[in-house]
């Protein structure tokens, strides 16, 4: 907190609430914003069972019924594979479940190329916040680009309160600043095969460096 951190996003890859209890208590005790996470993914073809909107709704109700102190909820699609309809149904149900003023956040990666459509579905369902990135480190295993999202929202009832021309200038400066760093080509890749073996974007980047 003394170094400027205000929020900690707290997640367990298997959605085991027991693994979020003590860490959540410590985050709140330190006076930080505790954003508790429900991990999402789409199952590969031929797999059935977990990771349905009903599963996520059950997880959310378990969180609300627990004694874990938290301030907001993030739905985290680490592999970027959840199809937009599932996103919509999950967020729509969550919005009806949590208090009206509670922040619902969606985090995804653009590894499968559907990040923008996921966010549009989430916005229609009532999401509060989404995570975006800035070129040259947007897209692929990172988050969708902020300018692309701004463009995709044209003609809808929503927009991003940004000046796109200023962002273009900022991205030019950022690209120059990043020119001395190696960016693995795999980290910029969009692959149609990701939904067949969902791997988190961060894990994919780390394992190819």
PLM region spans:
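Catalytic cores and adjacent flexible loops of soluble metabolic enzymes
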Residues: 1-9, 13-209
């Amino acid at each position: 907190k003394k170094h400027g951190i205000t929020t900690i996003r707290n997640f367990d890859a298997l959605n085991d609430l027991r693994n979020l209890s003590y860490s959540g208590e410590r985050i709140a005790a330190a006076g930080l914003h505790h954003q508790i996470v429900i991990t999402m993914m789409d199952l590969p073809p031929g797999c059935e069972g977990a990771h349905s909107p009903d599963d996520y709704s059950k997880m959310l109700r378990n969180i609300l019924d627990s004694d874990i102190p938290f301030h907001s909820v993030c739905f985290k699609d680490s592999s970027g594979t959840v199809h937009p309809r599932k996103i919509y149904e999950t967020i729509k149900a969550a919005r009806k479940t949590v208090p009206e003023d509670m922040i619902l956040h969606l985090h995804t990666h653009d590894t499968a190329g559907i990040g923008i459509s996921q966010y549009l579905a989430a916005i229609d369902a009532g999401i509060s916040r989404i995570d975006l990135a800035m070129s040259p480190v947007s897209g692929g295993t990172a988050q969708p680009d902020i300018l692309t999202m701004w463009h995709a929202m044209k003609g809808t009832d929503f927009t991003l309160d940004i000046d796109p021309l200023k962002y273009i200038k900022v991205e030019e400066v950022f690209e120059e600043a990043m020119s001395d760093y190696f960016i693995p080509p795999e980290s910029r890749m969009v692959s149609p095969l990701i939904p067949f073996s969902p791997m988190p974007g961060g894990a994919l980047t780390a394992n190819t460096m």
